[in-house]
Amino acid sequence: MSYTVKVEEARPATEKMPSAGPVYRSIYARDGLLELPEGLQSPWEFLSGSVKRSPKTPMLGRRQIKDSEAGPYVWLTYQEVHDEAIRMASAMRSRGVNPGDRCGIYGTNCPQWIVAMQACYSHAITYVPLYDTLGPNAVEFIINHGEVSIAFVQENKISAILSCLPNCSSLLKTIVSFGNITSVQKKETEALGVSCFSWEEFSQLGNLSGELPEKHRTDICTLMYTSGATGEPKGVILTNEAIMAEILSTDNMLELTDKVFSEEDVYFSYLPLAHVYDQIVENYCIYKGSAIGYWRGDIRFLMDDLQELKPTIFCGVPRVYDRIYAGIFHKVSSGGTLKKMLFQYAYNYKMANMEKGLPHGQAAPLMDKLFFDKIKQGFGGRIRLMFSGAAPLPHHVEEYLRVTSCAALSQGYGLTESCGGCLTSIANIFPMIGTVGVPMTTIEARLESVPEMGYDALSDKPRGEICLRGTTLFSGYHKREDLTKDVLVDGWFHTGDIGEWQPNGAMKIIDRKKNIFKLSQGEYVPVENIEGIYLQCPLIASIWVYGNSFESFLVAVVVPERLALENWAANRNLTDDFKSLCENPKASKYILDELNSTAKKHQLRGFEMLKAVYLEPNPFDMERDLITPTFKLKRPQLLKYYKDHVDKLYSEAKEARV
């Protein structure tokens, strides 16, 4: 059975454009893409609707900390969050912030983050997530580029904002702490002409009276900054329509294939709210009246928070699921021969039934009770639905968790530019394992051939760049019409990811077209920019950096500067020739340490550091098809040529970390 339908024929190649395959939709949208209900104009209506239905339902929860001990979760109701958002929006208006102005939100996941976002929704103010994982100067860049005039900031991020103020105080005029503010901080900001408030102080500036401004689908809901190919963040413009369509499409797909969220559900929030993935999930929770419980923001206590909250919905990235898989696998493997055999029998029995089409809950109830329920308890005991996104989930990990977690697991694919998920696997369709599924009900997808990489969208096994069209797409990059024109062509967004259609209509991610890739934790790596920094190390002549999207770190093939390496060897009384030196582990460690020293000097982030290198004595050349006539690296060919070395680097680096 195919889960997609063809709605447009393939496009042949022309002198200016490569060929493109047919256009497909999900079978659940065969009669047309999902349309927003008439009159729906803003995501604010999702919160106000839930308040009307169930004002006293718990909405946002966090653990109270007393004497360094975490207590139970304490909750704000839907009515309380609604009223606090109105007060905060009223206070913003009193400070001269008007509809269409920009409001920054800077901090880890917590109720105040969502209240600030909802305050923006209520008065048609554009919210701009601020976060520093895009680089050391990213917050300052986003404030200036996004023209942020007010910012809600977590207490422990106040100092970071203050360090930016000398270069952005002409724009940023108001800072509101998620909690308290010190007198010293107030004086420091006032000296620069900026007002600083505690959360309580600012709340008291607002009130619940007054009419809300008119809102429109075309309003810019958020400017969400994402990694740029050169390291400079790009501001992705997402409208109210895109956000709402994504949320309703999520509901649509869950209704058709599994079970929608409800007021009985509890979501565990720990993935960064500054990213589109978690924002969409939390917006969907609000639309359905579900509860959202926040972690403490400390990875050491994540499992403790999970056990206390006992959520029903869990979202993760491949790196998280890989760790969960490794933990389960280790426990089973160390449990003795008999226990291991019984577990494997239960696993095989349940998997066989799931392959026959039985949903996970009906595949092996007895085996669940005897073996797999203990794994479910690790998530708190109530998990019914898990999502994976941000990078491809390894096939073996997805299969293992589908069988053992006693929960439905759905893997999706999306980008900031597609407002989160644009393709999703159907949780109870076992053959979709290893794929990112079918288009959401707001999206059409096609593949475009990439001849230079050998990918043909018209072949028997269609492969090419994934292109998207639909209502959840972004409107462009803020102040970067040039970049917008590069990726939005004739209404089609060119993702830069290479996909392969499967016989059942699901999409599999197989490669990356652009010289920027994603690691397993979801971080983007602008590889050319990073290689340029590493090339400033005087010990190397050439470098090819590689990151497998199933791994969380980078490795590299390096051509050392011959004289520099030989001088290093002579100073240590090593008499090896150059080729032998390149095979010497001490030389590899020396080069690796010097490269990472260069990286630190230029403030590369932790995941941009190298964990292992292979020293290549021969320069990259055209004879081996490793470079172009203009000396540009041919990355697919480099990966093919050095694949065995790359696999060994990853294997050895992971062994060294254990």
UniProtKB/Swiss-Prot annotation:
Indicate the family of this protein.
Belongs to the ATP-dependent AMP-binding enzyme family.
Q: What is its EC number?
A: 6.2.1.-
Q: Enumerate the Gene Ontology biological process terms.
A: cutin biosynthetic process; wax biosynthetic process
Which parts of the sequence are annotated with region: SBD2? Answer: 412-477
Annotated region (SBD1) at 298-411
User: Is Plastid set as a keyword in this record?
Assistant: no
Q: Which InterPro entries match?
A: AMP-dep_synth/lig_dom, ANL_N_sf, LC-FACS_euk
User: Which positions does UniProt annotate for ATP binding?
Assistant: 226-234, 411-416, 497, 509-512, 632
Q: Which Gene Ontology terms cover its molecular function? A: ATP binding; CoA-ligase activity; long-chain fatty acid-CoA ligase activity
Q: What is the first-listed, main subcellular location in coarse terms? A: cytoplasm
Write down the Gene3D superfamilies for this protein, in alphabetical order: N-terminal domain of ligase-like
Listed GO cellular component terms? cytosol; endoplasmic reticulum; membrane
Question: Would the keyword Magnesium turn up in this protein's UniProt record?
Answer: no
Q: Where in the cell is it found?
A: Cytoplasm, Cytosol
| Record's keyword terms, sorted | ATP-binding, Cytoplasm, Ligase, Nucleotide-binding
Protein's name in the database = Probable CoA ligase CCL6
Expressing tissues? Mostly expressed in glandular trichomes (lupulin glands) after flowering, and, to a lower extent, in stems, leaves, cones and flowers.
- Which comment does the entry carry about domains? Both substrate-binding domains (SBD1 and SBD2) are involved in the substrate recognition, and are sufficient to confer the substrate specificity.
